[in-house]
Design a protein with these regions (language model features):
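Active-site-proximal mixed secondary-structure blocks
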Residues: 1-43, 51-165
């Protein structure tokens, strides 16, 4: 068994250390977070940090990285207070991963990736039609995590769409 102490961990190259630490919590689900800005332009971004926080009320959160660059997903959620979470499946994982590329604020990731937006009346953010399990949330709280300048974005589930399979 390999043993790695904190000094060894800190002396790893940044990229390798990131890969090691990211893998420690095991398998992570891949999810696409759908948002719209005030002009109605859809945004889509992949996240692996989605976590269940409670059932009553039904709360789910995700971690967003520090604001060292423009974060369209976070900006849109702050503006509209709504977002969707769409589980990625084997039918579109490559297109989902493409959402991690850098796009300008006016560019729609749905168009860039070939994924299909699903808009439902009363929900102010797009779903991903290809996703088998998707749900809408309204923003409840954004919690700053001072240790690494990330944010925990917490939403309450308002709608769930699930394939019958």
């Amino acid at each position: 068994m390999k043993y790695i102490n904190q000094d060894e961990l800190l002396n790893m190259t940044t990229r390798y250390r990131t890969q090691v630490v990211n893998s420690l919590s095991g398998f992570k689900s891949a999810n696409l977070i759908g948002t719209s800005n005030k002009e109605g332009i859809h945004n889509l971004a992949i996240f692996s940090s989605v976590v269940h926080l409670g059932a009553s009320p039904a709360l789910v959160g995700f971690i967003t990285r520090p604001n060292t660059v423009v974060r369209h997903t976070l900006e849109n959620i702050q503006q509209t207070k709504q977002f969707t979470i769409n589980q990625v499946n084997d039918g579109f994982w490559q297109a989902a991963h493409q959402t991690s590329a850098r796009y300008e604020a006016g560019e729609c990731e749905f168009k860039q990736t070939g994924l299909t937006p699903l808009v439902i009346e009363g929900v102010g953010a797009p779903f991903v039609r290809e996703s088998r399990l998707k749900y809408a949330l309204k923003l409840k709280e954004i919690v700053p995590i001072q240790l690494n300048d990330t944010l925990l974005v917490i939403g309450e589930i308002t709608n769930i769409l699930c394939d019958k399979e």
